[in-house]
A protein has these predicted regions:
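Conserved beta-strand-loop-alpha-helix hinge in the C-terminal portion
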Residues: 226-250
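Helix-to-loop junction immediately C-terminal to a conserved catalytic motif
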Residues: 53
């Protein structure tokens, strides 16, 4: 289970550029849940993922994953617990290394052992099988550098890499936004399969209302650094994109400060 309790994040604290990115955010997610996250730009979506990954340490509140308080543990300390796939396909892998070497690094994430153990004969066979399952023909290119691949191929491999270290939590930060429609559809189908196979607790940030409804079993909306909409079960079932957009607009209307409040 993931618990975010009264999370506050302030960037540039005490400076003229001070900005509150999260403000008393509360969110509880059951093990194995697949939650889609929507919200306007600046709502705090990526910051929330950063707090879960350990990239961003909250100025207030508590973060619990699997019953462990990880609030002050950084990214390296959470590497075995949390995997993340970013919007930019180039971010999640090293272009100068081969496909096989990238997979080996991912498998060794959070462990003290180096690449030697991760590149054993048994591991190599496993890597090849995992890549072959993508049906992209990359199993015959395991020695190719990652920077020779397309963005979609790299993103598909980033998803596979996210499953290799036994992480409990998968964070997806608009991971199809930079892909063409066909590849985005392929990556989402792959996402659904891997999440189900590995029973990953998943948070997926997306600007696509269609994706927000088609995937997962719960949708939350952030605005002003807080959760302002949370729909699941019967309340979510049957919602159309138009319904969700209307709910989105209503939340913005009723949670945005008035001109008078802004002046104060």
């Amino acid at each position: 289970m993931i618990e975010l309790s009264q999370i506050g994040v302030t960037f540039g604290r005490g400076t003229p550029l001070e900005k509150k990115a999260l403000a008393g955010l509360d969110l509880t997610i059951d093990n194995g849940a697949f939650v889609t996250v929507i919200g306007s730009n600046g709502a705090g979506k990526s910051t929330m993922l950063g707090v879960l990954a350990g990239d961003v340490l909250p100025t207030e509140g508590r973060v619990t994953i699997g019953g462990k308080d990880v609030t002050r543990r950084d990214t390296a300390d959470r590497a075995r617990l949390v995997a993340r796939v970013f919007q930019d396909p180039l971010t999640g892998s090293c272009g100068a290394l081969t496909i096989e070497e990238n997979l080996a690094l991912a498998a060794a994430r959070g462990k003290r052992r180096g690449l030697g153990s991760a590149l054993s004969s048994r591991r190599r066979d496993m890597f090849r099988d995992r890549v072959s399952a993508l049906r992209l023909g990359l199993e015959d290119r395991m020695g190719d550098r990652m920077d020779l691949l397309s963005g979609g191929q790299r993103q598909a491999l980033s998803l596979v890499m996210a499953t290799l270290a036994g992480s409990e939590v998968l964070l997806l930060d608009e991971h199809t936004a930079a892909l063409d429609p066909g590849m985005a559809e392929f990556v989402m189908e792959l996402t659904q399969r891997l999440v189900s196979e590995h029973r990953l607790t998943t948070l997926m940030v997306t600007h696509s209302m269609r994706q927000a409804l088609d995937f997962g079993t719960r949708t939350v909306m952030l605005h002003g650094g807080r959760v302002v909409l949370d729909v699941a079960g019967d309340s979510r079932h049957g919602l159309t994109v138009e319904d969700l957009i209307e709910m989105f607009r209503n939340c913005l209307l009723y949670t945005s400060p008035s001109p008078r409040d802004k002046r104060q």
